[in-house]
Structure formats: structure tokens, C-alpha cells
Amino acid sequence: MNLQELHTKIQLQIDIKIEVNTMDSIFKQLFQYGYHDTEITSIDCEGLEVKLNFDKGIYLLDENGNETILSKPMQVILKISSYSDSFEESFEIKEYGKKIKYLEYITLKKYLQKESFGISMCYYSNFDSCILFDGGFSKRNIMFSIDGVNEIIIQEL
């Protein structure tokens, strides 16, 4: 490999890494899969990283964007912008019904230890790079959002 080929290869690797961190690519990465009627079975957070586990999988999409079959168990890793001191600053969790009640992350984690979070809808906003999951547990309607997402990794468990 000559110097020019090596330079081109390195530049391509740099371009790919930059593309991974754009808001548009977060949207594309997130919505390569379908989340409606899937379940978050556990959540783990450390530092500026949020890991959502889908033990029953997430939906694979066909060429028209329609949900087809469930994947193998998957993990969605969300990396949060460094302007937050911790992942908790990027979370907003609301239980809603007749009234709206704000919840702490630890409460959501406790609920997940008892049962899975069923997802009705998943939204993404370019404003502050925010992902919102709407759904809940058997007797609780919950929306939780994570803002400042600057990278997403979706992988098999």
C-alpha cells in the first residue's frame, strides 16, 4: 500500500467516525429498528452512558420500514454529551394519568426489577438530541426521555 492509499484509508475511517456522531446518524441508527410493542427489560447507567436491554429483541424492519420479526436480544447504548455531569441530569421521567408525577431514575430502575417496560412509541428530536420512550408497566403510564445523546450503539446481548 502506497502513502496515498494509506492516507485515503485513514481519511475514510475518520469520516465514518465523524458520521457516527452526527444527530442525523443517531436518528438513522435508532430507527433501523422498530420499538413499538417491545420491552426494555433492564437499564444500567454509569457515568455518561445509558444501557437499555431488550431481552426479547427489537423489531427488524423491511425495505419499506415495516416491522417484521423480533431480533435476538439486543442492547441499546446511549452515550450522553459531556456537558452533563452525570446521566441523571439528562433523564426526565414522568408517570402520567389523572396527574403527572416526576420520578427519579432509581424509581424507574426499581420498577424494571419487577417487570418490563412496554414501549408504545419511541421518538427522537434533533433539539438537544433527545430520545423519548412512551409506554409503561402494567398499571403505570410512563414517559422517559434522555437528552444530550451524542452517540448510539445497538448490539446483540
Briefly describe each language-model feature range.
Residues N2-L157:
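Surface-exposed, interaction-prone regions used to assemble/regulate multi-protein complexes
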